[in-house]
Amino acid sequence: MSSLPKRTTLDKINILTTVGYPRPHLGGSLIAHPCERYLVYSFRWAYMPKIESKLNRIFRLGDAIEDIIIKDLKRAGITHGGSQTRVSGYRGHAGGSVDGIVEEVPEYPDETLLFEAKSMNHNNFLDVKRKGVKVSKPIYYGQMQIYMGKLDLDKAMFVSLDKNTSDLYIEFVHFDEYEYEHLIDREEDIIEAKHINEFPRISNNPSWFNCKFCDAKEVCHSGITPEK
């Protein structure tokens, strides 16, 4: 009788580092997502997001890179604090954590700025550098607007690191009151939604790029009943 194959080290790592749990709130890092229907599904726990082992490592690598960026900022004489400061949104059902608050920035030595760090692949890095974060990564831009508005800050220091080359890109993002108010209204609309049909699909084609890789695809396009 042949024995069952034993799990390898990689098998065990992949099993133990795969996690899945819903967010307890509507995240500030998602509020500028292009699909409002997705945000309703996410807030209402209509699906169980699953973070595979590889993606989990990518997230943890991002945390490690953020620490490296912060150390470099401090070497440049910039004061960093307030890491993971929480901000709260509509009736406590929305919110998020900032990467920090910085002061003594050479470009704005007398001001206090929001700090947000992101690591990305080479193509995304070049796109952000060429177009600016507002156009290239509107979700990041919206995240910073929410945090600046909640913390009463006029500017954000956005730092991106190219994971292929380790190059840095720094951009200063100014507070946009119109965008902030729009996102605050969006928070309320998502949280107070009574029926998913209040929000049309971003596309009726499940193979469209944003839908194809969406965690809520089965619930949204196939009509599968949520687990709970």
Language-model-derived ranges and their functions:
Residues M1-I68, A76, S207-N210:
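Charged, glycine-rich intrinsically disordered N-terminal tails and low-complexity linkers that flank
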Residues K134-K137, Y141, I146-K228:
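Metal-dependent nuclease catalytic regions and adjoining charged, substrate-binding loops involved
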Residues L55, K129-V135:
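Short glycine-enriched, charge-decorated loop/helix-capping segments at active-site entrances
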Residues S2-S3, S53, G96, I224-K228:
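Cys/His-rich finger/ribbon microdomains and the adjacent scaffold used
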